[in-house]
Amino acid sequence: MDVDHLRRLHAVDTERPGAWIRRRRRTITGEQVVLSAAVLGTLRLLLDARAERRLPHLSERLGHVVRTNSEAILGAATPKVTTDFSRGVAITSSIHPDAVTHIEPVRYGRGSNAMGLLATILVGPGRLPRPLRFAIAAATHPRTFLQSLSVRRWSERTVILLVMQSLDNSLRIMLRGNRRGPHLRSTQGHGEPNPTYLPIGHRAARLAAEAIGGVPGGSLNESILDIPITAHILGGCCIGDGPGTGVIDAYQRVFGHPGLHVCDGSAVSANLGVNPSLTITAMTERAMSLWPNRGEADPRPPLGEPYRRIAAVPPRTPAVPAGAPAALRAGSAGAV
């Protein structure tokens, strides 16, 4: 990505992903560019562009306040298929065992067994280092450990527990280089350290195992490396009132580069404690609803000026017909 400040155009270079030959490289230019490459993709692209001075005015807050949803991925599995847990909707229910914790049971479709490679035995708390506790648990329960290595019919035997919390902990993601080239690195950020052990999640996994006649399980990252794992990385391009406090404004426009917008999970600045997909969708729909129609005046204040509430802009030629269930109605287009 590059920017032509004289003509206020952004240039995006594209190529066919994964191709060794016939990459079909081309450059697309436009006055407005919406960046939505998921958190790690967006951060990598913007950090690269800032380091190479292609987007030199990006905020120094880029990569700060990256959230993991304060998550743990646990579960329970039976040695053999007694009940096919792969049948049904992926997520149908959830519980809130306390004020900050949210647990969702998750199922994978039949044949979706690759995630089982990240699963292992559950390792609880103790005074010894966690890798040593893992080794002791594997040695004292060899049959359970060996069964955890098998991914045969894993999705049919397993109930996954997605444990999420709305606590204030974060990471900072930076661009670092070595002989192999630049790569992303993370360090502890704002708030409490990211948890590698959630007692309430472990209790839920043990209760689930008891209910299905199986054994509780955790993830390799946590059990062996004492490093948390997440399915919902968020933040890094947080909203602020200026480049000193955020990367984008409340309309999700990038400070320092008019015409560039970020509309994905990197704009979410908090641990939600729930699956973030609908939040990301709602934030993006809100940002897009404030864009002017082509040829009309922009109702938003200029980039860098204080936020003010404005009414959503009705589309001139809506893609959804007026009588359709999802049509924009008068009550849904108020000031935001």
Region annotations inferred by a language model:
Residues 43-45, 84-85, 172-173, 247-249, ...:
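Short helix/loop capping segments that flank catalytic or ligand/cofactor-binding pockets
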Residues 63-67, 196-214, 289, 297, ...:
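Extended C-terminal subregions enriched in glycine
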Residues 3, 13-93, 264, 277-302:
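Glycine-rich loop(s) and the adjacent beta-strand/alpha-helix scaffold that form part
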Residues 1, 159-162, 184-270:
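A glycine-rich dinucleotide-binding beta-alpha-beta segment and adjacent secondary-structure elements
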Residues 59-183, 190, 233, 255, ...:
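FAD cofactor-binding and catalytic pocket of flavoenzymes
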Residues 1-8:
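Feature captures the FAD/FMN-dependent oxidoreductase FAD-binding
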